[in-house]
Amino acid sequence: MATPHINAEMGDFADVVLMPGDPLRAKYIAETFLEDAREVNNVRGMLGFTGTYKGRKISVMGHGMGIPSCSIYTKELITDFGVKKIIRVGSCGAVLPHVKLRDVVIGMGACTDSKVNRIRFKDHDFAAIADFDMVRNAVDAAKALGIDARVGNLFSADLFYSPDGEMFDVMEKYGILGVEMEAAGIYGVAAEFGAKALTICTVSDHIRTHEQTTAAERQTTFNDMIKIALESVLLGDKE
């Protein structure tokens, strides 16, 4: 049944949901990659759609910006609509010199300055990691598509406009591949409620060099990321 934030019914969502931050990107994914897509949510403009990809039922829905927003939507999808796997597909900023614009990053784990997972985990540190099989399937899908993908840790920041420039030095030292705002929260929700999750990001800007991708470049590499996510779902069905 419908929740305060999702006006769908049980069965409207597939067991796998791709989740970009922007609901308009969810609409783009549905219109570009899915067949027979239909809208299943529009509360607060957070659009959700369900269709098929190569015959496989898949849903896509926006999650908004930041851990509080994505935590609400992922929790409700899992506990109220029976979703088993969530794949966040979004953008990130790079800090390492060898990570370039348009690189695809598969988030094996996610560090964070958010306290949300500590609240969930009785004030202890929680290792926010992706599901291993989902990581492996994404890596295999990228290889099959001929797309280079980096695998490693993300950093999920609470502040987009952070005043702490020195923290980027620490991230570089620890080999953080990309900075975004949601992965650690999604991994925490999935762990708490017995689901599986993965984050795949495209590098849209470089925090050190201030380089940014153009709108056209973002769209091209965004499509690559979506192809990896969708093909990884099909590989997961073969397990």
UniProtKB/Swiss-Prot annotation:
The record's listing under PROSITE patterns reads: PNP_UDP_1
User: In the UniProt record, which is one GO cellular component term?
Assistant: cytosol
Q: Which reaction does it catalyse?
A: a purine D-ribonucleoside + phosphate = a purine nucleobase + alpha-D-ribose 1-phosphate; a purine 2'-deoxy-D-ribonucleoside + phosphate = a purine nucleobase + 2-deoxy-alpha-D-ribose 1-phosphate; inosine + phosphate = alpha-D-ribose 1-phosphate + hypoxanthine; adenosine + phosphate = alpha-D-ribose 1-phosphate + adenine
> Which Pfam families does the protein's record reference?
PNP_UDP_1
Q: What is the effect of changing R25A?
A: Severe loss of catalytic activity. 20-fold decrease in affinity for phosphate
Documented EC number(s): 2.4.2.1
Q: What does this protein do?
A: Catalyzes the reversible phosphorolytic breakdown of the N-glycosidic bond in the beta-(deoxy)ribonucleoside molecules, with the formation of the corresponding free purine bases and pentose-1-phosphate. Acts on 6-amino and 6-oxopurines including deoxyinosine, deoxyguanosine, deoxyadenosine, adenosine, guanosine, and inosine. Does not act on xanthosine. May also catalyze a phosphate-dependent transfer of the pentose moiety from one purine base to another.
- In Swiss-Prot or TrEMBL terms, this protein is called Purine nucleoside phosphorylase DeoD-type
Upper classification of the source organism reads:
Bacteria, Pseudomonadati, Pseudomonadota, Gammaproteobacteria, Enterobacterales
Q: Per UniProt, what is the name of the gene that codes for the protein in this document? A: deoD
